[in-house]
Amino acid sequence: MASEDRYNVKETEAKWQTAWAEGGCFTAREDRTRPKYYVLEMFPYPSGRIHMGHVRNYTLGDVVARFKRAQGFNVLHPMGWDAFGLPAENAAIQRGVHPATWTRQNIAIMREQFKPMGLSIDWSREVSTCEPAYYRHEQKMFLDFLKAGLAYRRESWVNWDPVEHTVLANEQVIDGKGWRSGAPVERRKLSQWFLRITRYAEDLLAAIGDLDRWPDKVRLMQTNWIGRSEGARVRFGLVGRDQALEVYTTRPDTLFGASFCAISANHPLAAEIAATNPDLAAFIAECGRMGTSEVEIETAEKKGFDTGLKVRHPFDPAWELPVYVANFVLMEYGTGAIFGCPAHDQRDMDFARKYGLPVRAVVAPAGVDAEAFAKDLEASDTAFSEDGVAIASGFLDGLPVSEAKARAIAHIAELGAGEGVVQFRLRDWGVSRQRYWGCPIPIIHCDDCGPVPVPEDQLPVLLPEDVTFDKPGNPLDHHPTWKHVACPQCGKPARRETDTFDTFFESSWYFARFCAPHDTDRAFEREAVDYWLPVDQYVGGVEHAVLHLLYSRFFTRALRDCGYLGVSEPFTGLFTQGMICHETYRDTDGAWLSPDQIDKAADGTATLLSDGSPVSVGRSEKMSKSKMNTVDPTAILESYGADAARLFMLSDSPPDRDMDWTDSGIEGAWRYIGRLWRMALQPQIDPGAVGAPLPADLGPGAAALVRHVHKAVAGVTDDLEKFRFNAAVARLRELTNAIAALDGKEAGAGAVYRFALETAARLAAPMIPHIAEEMWSHLGRDGLLAETPWPTWDPLMLIDDQVTIAVQVNGKMRGTVDLPKDAKREDAEAAALALPTVLAQLAGAAPRKVIVVPNRIINVVV
């Protein structure tokens, strides 16, 4: 407990956490008489240890939850575990422990690490995605998606992670490498299950404009990822063949500048030619070893292979263009074929120069000498890709680019050589993963019937527990019995689908499961989801902008259309927090060192604790195990307590920016907690003023403090509403400074001191709840502060009755005086003439005159 001379952090925080739990303060129930507020942080993967990023993320969400609860909202603030995934399989291989055992042990450990943070979480709603009670509903959703045409199977080129032996979605390939393993990704062709996210591309894009409580950067990232473009599908007839090469282009206005066509290494035409051309087959194999990211493809050297085929230009059948297989053409975008216009696309220019292809200028800036411009451009290695007017383009000449595009598309359609189309960069979501520790896909493969859905009365399809990890790849593939079943349609021997779902499948709907997590018959209790959804405030990392966040938006629409939900968007508000950073340290051999291995001096230099050898201090970077610049949250909570950790996370910098972890910062937060407690022990607190109105007769300092309290309440309220948590902490510190400065001998000081401290505790409660509860209790207030309404303020108290007036001598600034608003002229003169700087200018003489501009300026003329 807190004593009269020392604040016992451990005992006090444990006491209030027990009180909150026993009082059921954070247990949420539907109550249609109250406005709801659903706060959710992106749920964690159970790695076995929380990190400082968790501390920041959950502190931010908890401040919102506590604040909204105090404002009278019915708050839902749940917790769960994103529990499937490859790390558990890796642990099984490395440690010889079953993934289920490893995962459940980690959940138990992390739950006990989270609880000392004092989070206002409704733990009764806890879910884990690896439990059959959760994923059985996911399997049912998939079958419903299958019926609705939202799920399908096809053979496709996939991103294969050779280390994790699984397929990655495009979004999971970062700079050509697997997002988890970091291994260079390979291209393979496999039969995969897909979700038809492209059906919602237009809607997903259009609705981004309505997400006005999302960060602009996330909305822009999703806009670019969906990638809507308007262009044309153009058919170039193949010379000597009764077929055409179909090309998608966003620049049909540049068709007169075409000098070649290029197809993807994965294009069917490339495969056909490669079957009899070993050199092309070798080139295609080389392309398959390239990185898969667009950035990597764009920056790589442009290479091509001349197939020997020619195509006819749609505007002139006599005009023939060569067809190349090129390493920069993506099969996944458009039609997997392009026409090259080197003069107006830098990639095409690089390719043309490499292979000696012609460069024809067909767009020039308005108002220039078109012939001279074209001559210079055609001799240059730099493409002109800006807007202008069409030149050397027949019927398009003189038209601005926008008009030339429309006219070109119309002409293509008239010729029967193509049509205008809208294209999206977004591709359907491949959800098949070749691993054990995931949700089984509820499909049975029959040689006669093909893929057959598992009957709903046989759900869930459970993962077998008797698996081994002594062979590469998916243990389900070589399980002796699990995959062998009878076909549900014909009864003949068949095989289970051994792929499991991408773990983003689970995280795309978990937020809705929290609304009624114990319903065994349905994924969602409709009354509950209709009440709680959408999530009002979601908190998490920006790295999920085009992964989890986009998939969740798609899933919500798909579930709506399948009758599960009544909303279209999952998250009304989104906040993306910054990262936690720390200095990095290396020894003389360049090996990374952890902060607890070094001794850092006041001048910023550091030495190794073990032998005193010099340590190189590097820049502050994101905390990571690889660079050993992490700080253990459990050690911080043990040493300083939850409130100090929370306060430092909130006060150091704006929550959307990266913050640097420093020992001095956490120590400063800890000292402030102690200061608050000592203020609550002050003898000037009026013991008889509990709940009583303030006395009418107050001294000037006490009256000023009352006004300061009202301003603090208004300011902190606004700061918390707008996620300016660091500003809210600063206002709280200013208020405590003002309280400490109150003269206890003034009239009404004891009552005002109590009023101000009680209000400070109420303002602090969302941020540092334990010390706030202890102060509230010590000050004699009944009930839990966690259940106490948010303080209000008097708008009249926000109007300043004091003004700061500039004082000049002969027009030059010499100081300021603080006076009551609309002070009498003689009072203003007297205050100005009493300033030491003015007295020095007067040098004992009387002023010639004093000019007073009320509430603004006093000018002393000497």
UniProtKB/Swiss-Prot annotation:
One Gene Ontology cellular component annotation held by this UniProt entry: cytosol
Q: Name one Pfam family in it.
A: tRNA-synt_1_2
Q: Which UniProt keywords apply?
A: Aminoacyl-tRNA synthetase, ATP-binding, Cytoplasm, Ligase, Nucleotide-binding, Protein biosynthesis
User: What enzyme class is recorded for this protein?
Assistant: ligase
List localization entries: Cytoplasm
**Keyword Protein biosynthesis in annotation:** yes
Which family does the record claim for this protein? Answer: Belongs to the class-I aminoacyl-tRNA synthetase family.
* Name listed for the protein in its UniProt record: Leucine--tRNA ligase
* UniProt source species: Rhodospirillum rubrum (strain ATCC 11170 / ATH 1.1.1 / DSM 467 / LMG 4362 / NCIMB 8255 / S1)
Query: What is the name of the gene encoding this protein?
Result: leuS
